[in-house]
Structure formats: C-alpha cells, structure tokens
C-alpha cells in the first residue's frame, strides 16, 4: 500500500514542476476557452503557501501537484484558478468531494469563487468525475467542475505530434508510458526516438 503512495508522489512531482514552468501553455492546451479569457500580460501568482494552509491534508509525502494560482481576466478582474491534477492510477470515490471541499475552503479564504480544473491522468476510460452534489430534506447542492482526460488524447495522436505546445509532448509521453507500462525495453526505445 505504501508503494502506491510513493508512486503517486513520484508522479505528482514532475507534473507540478512542468505546470509551474509552463502554466500558460498548460491552460492553453487543456482549457483553451478559459485561456482566452485570461490576461496573460499580468503575471500569474502561485499561491502555494495559502493553498497549504487551506488544505493541510493535501500533503502526502512529496505530493504537491495541486496548484492554486491567481490570474486576471481580460478587463482586470482577479480570479482564483484551482488546478487539481489527478495522477493516481486508480480512481478514487471521494475525489469529487475533495474538489468540493477545496472549493469551499478557497471561497471562505478569498471570498471569491475559484475555477476548479481537473486533469485526469488515470487509465480507466470509464472514470470521469466532474460533479459533486447532495440532496437532504429539501436542501440540495450541485457543484460541477471542468475536467480533461489524458486518455482522450490518444485519438488525437497526429495532432499532438505537430503541436508546438510542450504539453502535447507531455501527454504523448504519459500515454506511451501507460501503454508500455509492462514492456520496459519498448518504453526505452520510444523515449529515445
């Protein structure tokens, strides 16, 4: 069981590094409609310290893939953008609830609603969480969040090969790693291509 946690921490670390380095390209690649509404002339602010205070349970070993970023809309309004990367290999039943909990904590702290974006990196084509809700004695709540599934990019391989966005290469590498998980020799050959 501890092995899974270490695998997850190891997988999260490269994601966090590349997200920080190429944040704009990530949003442009995975969430182009949102990218078009952001004023990229104003520097983004990574709110790591604030996010750690809000979500002390988000640290598991070296796991820090969750990103809380302040960006500005075209026109000057500040928005909080929550990027949550789901890089674990197994679907997790409480994942939508966790995204909702993050939303509540961020809203409570900043007094403005965040945008929750999720990149699903697992290999289960059926697992596609995008909402959390409940109804109890006449009270109800429905929270929807935006997701992309890396598996879906497998059908767009030719498009990825010609893309100039660094995340096209990241996605191709991720998909090939999943495809060749048990074939180390083939994986090494593909990486050296």
Question: Positions of the model-derived regions?
Answer:
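Conserved single-residue anchors adjacent to enzymatic active/cofactor-binding motifs
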Residues: 1-193
């Amino acid at each position: 069981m501890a092995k899974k946690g270490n695998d997850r921490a190891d997988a999260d670390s490269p994601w966090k590094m590349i997200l920080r380095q190429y944040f704009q390209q990530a949003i442009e690649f995975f969430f182009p409609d949102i990218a078009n509404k952001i004023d990229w002339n104003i520097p983004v602010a990574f709110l790591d310290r604030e996010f750690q205070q809000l979500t002390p349970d988000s640290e598991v070993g070296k796991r820090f893939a969750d990103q809380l970023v302040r960006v500005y809309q075209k026109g000057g309004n500040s928005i909080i953008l929550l990027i949550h990367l789901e890089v674990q290999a197994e679907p997790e039943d409480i994942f939508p609830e966790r995204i909702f909990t993050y939303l509540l904590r961020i809203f409570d702290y900043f007094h403005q609603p965040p945008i929750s974006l999720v990149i699903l990196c697992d290999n289960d084509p059926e697992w596609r969480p995008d909402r959390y809700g409940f109804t109890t004695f006449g009270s109800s709540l429905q929270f929807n969040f935006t997701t992309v599934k890396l598996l879906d990019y497998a059908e767009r391989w030719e498009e990825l090969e010609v893309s100039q966005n660094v995340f096209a290469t990241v996605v191709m590498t991720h998909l090939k790693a999943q495809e060749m998980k048990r074939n180390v020799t083939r994986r090494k050959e593909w990486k050296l291509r």
